[in-house]
């Protein structure tokens, strides 16, 4: 079973995450940041990952630490659940439409963390959520999952739709990249023999 649990406690947040990469999309999310909860529920559903996340954060300051630390812990959980990465597809990409928005996401589960994020928002907030925190989440996730992640919104107007397209795109691409390829016959998908 490709599952993992992570607990991460700092002076700013207390985060617990569990994930089953071979789940059915069940989500139990409680970050106390409504928009982030919504995005993480989409991530679980569209990735077909079973995800439980509970966060207590310093929301009296703002939502930054809660969002970033959730990305860190979720990334760590994905990396742990993947183990030595034997048999995975490794690479995946997707174009994800959301009404007037189209985003492109590409992933390499390489062990070399990197983020290219070419998504902009015309507004500073979606409800009470700072739009700049979308990038902060993706940065934290990619660095801690150990993946190369390219995120680009080709076009779009509505900030909610843009955020939704990149979170759903991440989920759908990650779902394909972590999938077991039976032709790999349990090998690590690299000429080096490790990732």
Curated annotation (Swiss-Prot):
It is an enzyme of class 4 (lyase). GO terms for molecular function: imidazoleglycerol-phosphate dehydratase activity. InterPro entries: IGPD_sf, ImidazoleglycerolP_deHydtase, ImidazoleglycerP_deHydtase_CS, Ribosomal_Su5_D2-typ_SF. It holds the Pfam family IGPD. It is found in: Cytoplasm. Keywords: Amino-acid biosynthesis, Cytoplasm, Histidine biosynthesis, Lyase. Pathway: Amino-acid biosynthesis; L-histidine biosynthesis; L-histidine from 5-phospho-alpha-D-ribose 1-diphosphate: step 6/9. Gene3D superfamilies: Imidazole glycerol phosphate dehydratase, domain 1. It catalyses: D-erythro-1-(imidazol-4-yl)glycerol 3-phosphate = 3-(imidazol-4-yl)-2-oxopropyl phosphate + H2O. It comes from the Bacteria. One of its GO terms (biological process) is L-histidine biosynthetic process. Coiled coil: none annotated. Its EC number is 4.2.1.19. GO terms for cellular component: cytoplasm. NCBIfam families: PRK00951.1-5, PRK00951.2-1, PRK00951.2-4, PRK00951.2-6. Belongs to the imidazoleglycerol-phosphate dehydratase family. This is Imidazoleglycerol-phosphate dehydratase. The lineage of its organism: Bacteria, Pseudomonadati, Pseudomonadota, Alphaproteobacteria, Hyphomicrobiales.
